[in-house]
């Protein structure tokens, strides 16, 4: 009993140490990402683009809140999404059921994309398409191509030919889509580089490739994000063929 209790105490101490170290790491990353932009804006605010004191105060407070939010968001994503992705990927492959890998991969791709903050921002800037229609279209695109990426790892298919084929389809569709949709389509591909999507997708690939024992398994675990980024582009291009009206980004004013 004493050894078990001591073991539990040691585990908790180790976990607390890991969390503290990760917290320091994420704090440094967030500060280094936000502070340079903050300094540039303040420099412009005191020189060529004067801002009122109230706006400057709001900006500084907002920047501090952004840093705090990024710390906890990235910490939570790394401590939860990455381990979960690896375990889910390994468990999916152990089932040895192709239909289950396809179904789970698609559902996970859709859900993780809907939760992506970048997608919510993008959807709010497209005036001609309802927010939920755009969000679901992009999510389905990511889900379909996440399945394709997982099957590529599973069967050891080379990445380069797939990228050539899919991007050829993208550029072919681009010729039949209204110009207003082109910018939206290619911007939507950036959704797969968000802080929620990237850790989970990469961890999922690592989990699946870890079950394979061949020499190419490690290399095949990469390339998931590059394939998944094609999904939103194709989805929005197809959406553009349905919505033939012009799309315009709403111009958000800095201050009402």
Regions found by a protein language model. Give the residues of each.
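Cytosolic juxtamembrane amphipathic/interface segments immediately preceding
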Residues: 16-26, 88
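Short, hydrophobic transmembrane alpha-helix segments
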Residues: 46-56
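Helix-loop-helix junctions within the multi-pass membrane cores of secondary transporters/permeases
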Residues: 98-169
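Flexible loop linkers connecting adjacent transmembrane helices
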Residues: 78-96, 121-125
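Structural signature of hydrophobic alpha-helical transmembrane segments
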Residues: 64-68, 130-140, 192-200
């Amino acid at each position: 009993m004493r050894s078990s209790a001591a073991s539990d105490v040691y585990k908790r101490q180790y976990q607390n140490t890991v969390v503290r170290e990760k917290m320091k790491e994420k704090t440094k990353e967030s500060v280094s990402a936000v502070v340079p932009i903050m300094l540039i804006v303040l420099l412009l605010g005191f020189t060529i683009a004067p801002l009122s004191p109230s706006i400057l105060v709001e900006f500084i407070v907002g920047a501090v809140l952004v840093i705090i939010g990024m710390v906890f968001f990235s910490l939570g994503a790394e401590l939860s999404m990455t381990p979960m992705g690896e375990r889910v990927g390994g468990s999916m492959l152990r089932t040895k059921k192709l239909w289950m890998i396809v179904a789970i991969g698609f559902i996970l791709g859709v859900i993780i994309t809907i939760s992506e903050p970048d997608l919510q921002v993008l959807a709010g800037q497209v005036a001609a398409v309802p927010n939920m229609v755009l969000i679901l279209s992009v999510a389905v695109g990511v889900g379909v191509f996440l399945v394709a990426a997982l099957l590529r790892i599973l069967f050891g298919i080379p990445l380069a030919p797939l990228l050539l084929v899919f991007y050829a389809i993208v550029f072919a569709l681009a010729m039949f889509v209204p110009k207003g949709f082109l910018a939206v389509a290619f911007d939507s591909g950036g959704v797969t580089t968000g802080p929620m999507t990237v850790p989970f997708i990469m961890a999922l690939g690592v989990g699946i490739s870890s079950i394979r024992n061949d020499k190419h398994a490690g290399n095949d675990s990469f390339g998931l994000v590059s394939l998944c980024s094609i999904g939103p582009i194709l989805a929005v291009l197809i959406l553009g063929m349905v919505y033939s009206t012009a799309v315009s980004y709403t111009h958000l004013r800095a201050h009402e």
